[in-house]
A protein has these predicted regions:
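Residue-level detector of conserved catalytic or cofactor/ligand-binding positions
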Residues: 165-172
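Short acidic, flexible loop segments centered on an aromatic residue
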Residues: 112-128, 136
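Short acidic, gly/pro-rich beta-turn/loop elements at beta-sheet edges
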Residues: 73, 114-116, 130, 162-164
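Beta-strand elements of well-folded, non-transmembrane domains
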Residues: 108-110, 124-126, 158-160
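Secreted, periplasmic, or luminal enzymes acting at the cell surface/secretory milieu
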Residues: 1-115, 141
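Intrinsically disordered, low-complexity Pro/Gly/Ser/Thr-rich segments with frequent PxxP/GP/PP motifs
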Residues: 129-163
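Hydrophobic residues positioned within well-ordered beta-strands of beta-sheet architectures
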Residues: 102, 118, 152-154
């Protein structure tokens, strides 16, 4: 449990004794080794410079770096555990000029009620600009009783997939 606050002990007991089914997901990627982070060599005086920090991650921050460059990780972005199991089935993907809508069904295949996060990613085609392998476009958390299913829709704007450079290159 990370940054759980002053009630961390009470929350941990409820998770461990099964009175609460956890559903949180990691908001960052956890590398296997600190040196696996691209900025590790130049951050926090690791390069002998405590006055200036130079980030060279560019657009490849967090999961975008690890996914794009195929780095193995200890725990990926969005990782989380539960006392139940879920299956997510993509029902449809609809797109027009302005938006993309993904419809899915989340089925709780376990024996405990629980919550699951459905994540939608997109991959942009290659072009002149650097792009991560994939980017999170949207997500939604749904509560599903054991043995039941829940429909979910996630919509995002097509503009969210655009790239813009400072040398006036724009790619849809």
């Amino acid at each position: 449990m990370s940054q759980a606050g002053m009630n961390e002990g009470h929350a941990l007991v409820q998770v461990l004794n099964g009175t609460y089914n956890p559903s949180g997901k990691l908001t960052d990627t956890w590398a296997i080794d600190y040196k696996d982070y691209p900025a590790s060599a130049t951050i926090s005086n690791n390069d002998g410079n405590s006055l200036e920090e130079f980030y060279q991650d560019d657009i490849f921050v967090g999961y975008r770096y690890f996914d794009t460059f195929g780095k193995k990780v200890a725990y990926e972005f969005g990782y989380g555990l539960s006392y139940t199991d879920f299956e997510i089935h993509t029902d449809s993907v609809e797109a027009d000029e302005d938006q993309i809508k993904v419809s899915a069904t989340v089925t709780n295949t376990g024996t405990a009620d629980g919550k699951e996060v459905v994540e939608v990613y997109f991959s942009a085609p290659d072009g002149e600009l650097d792009k991560p392998y994939q980017e999170l476009a949207g997500y939604k958390k749904v509560e599903v009783e054991a043995g039941k299913s829940q429909k979910v829709e996630i919509t995002f704007d097509t503009d969210d997939m655009a790239r813009l450079s400072l040398i006036h290159i724009s790619e849809p």
